[in-house]
Structures are given as C-alpha cells and as structure tokens.
Amino acid sequence: MKVFLIGANGQIGQRLVSLFQDNPDHSIRAMVRKEEQKASLEAAGAEAVLANLEGSPEEIAAAAKGCDAIIFTAGSGGSTGYDKTLLVDLDGAAKAIEAAAIAGIKRFIMVSALQAHNRENWNEALKPYYVAKHYADKILEASGLTYTIIRPGGLRNEPGTGTVSAAKDLERGFISRDDVAKTVIASLDEKNTENRAFDLTEGDTPIAEALKKL
C-alpha cells in the first residue's frame, strides 16, 4: 500500500517514516512545506513532495495522487497561537479530507486527541485545540471515506512497549509516541479499525490484539 503522510516532520510523523522504512508491505510519500525538508526524509527512505496545508485541497490532492491511504498527524504545535491551531488542526485537516476525495483515496487515518469527542472532559486551558480536533474528526466521520480516528492520551518520548489500552472511552492516560506510530501502521491492515474512533493510552494488551478487540 502506498501511504501519503501529512505531518512527516512532527514527532509522530518522524517515527512513522522510520517504521515504514522497515515495512515491506507499505511505502510512504511524505508531504513537506519546504524544499530543504525533503533531503532528510528521502535519506530515511521516503518519497517527499511539496504541498502546504494552508494551500488548496487541489494542491494537496495533486501531491497525494496515486496513493492508497492518507495518514494525518499534522499539528500546529504548542509554540504557536490558536490562529495556527485553526488553520492546521481544523482547516488543514478538512482540506486533507477533501483532497482525499479529489484524489480518489478512500482510506484515511487521523491522529486526534484523547476525549476529543467528549466536551465534558476537555482541558479548559486547551479548549481551542480540542474544538479543532473535535470538528476535524466530525468532518472525517461524515466524509464517506473509510476512516480510523486514533485519539492518544498525553504524549511521551519514552521507548514504546508495544502494549496499549484502546477503547471508545478512556478518560485519562499517557502513551509513548512510538506506540502511537505503531498503532497507526497496525490500523492500516486491521479491518476492525475501519470506520471507528477510539482513545489510546498505555496498557497491557499487544497493539494488534487491542485493535481486534475494539
């Protein structure tokens, strides 16, 4: 399967590029905003193409054409204002979803945020971020694409364990970025994740088994 990765320079995106390098079943095309970002991704075994989430859906669709699935891990990051959260986490995601339809790509995996579907559990200090994730997820669910929405808990940089908790509702928890990336790739091949959204935290269940039990 040829996978189009949006957010390849982010922390989860970089882990995905590394994991795809050793995966014989999938190849990766990574979207970047700047020409100088291409070299490191190509050195890691990815095809790299230029496109911008603040551009048009048609621009993104042209970059993604010929791929079989889109993985969206992009985010504005904690150092930017909520204007960028709106432009990247919400509008950028909406454009990527529209681009999938334009390019004829049916499979779409979104990395969202724990409890983004449940307003009662949003962190007050991060409410605009949760609003963006909530409505981006809603747009994907209504798109007609075959979607998977993964809502990870607080992200950590410790090495992954390969074991997780995955369920429709997990009120709090943390997870290694390694294990988020591994769950994304496992979801590509696990039919039971299709048209599902789930929370993801640390746990004791091997990733493949956790996805089968959703």
Swiss-Prot record:
Pfam families associated with the record: NAD_binding_10
GO molecular function, one term: lyase activity
EC number: 4.-.-.-
Keywords: Lyase
Induction entry: By high salinity.
Active site: 129
SUPFAM superfamilies: NAD(P)-binding Rossmann-fold domains (SSF51735)
Stated family: Belongs to the NAD(P)-dependent epimerase/dehydratase family.
Protein name as catalogued: Uncharacterized sugar epimerase YhfK
Gene: yhfK
Broad class of enzyme this protein falls into: lyase
InterPro entries for the chain: NAD(P)-bd_dom, NAD(P)-bd_dom_sf
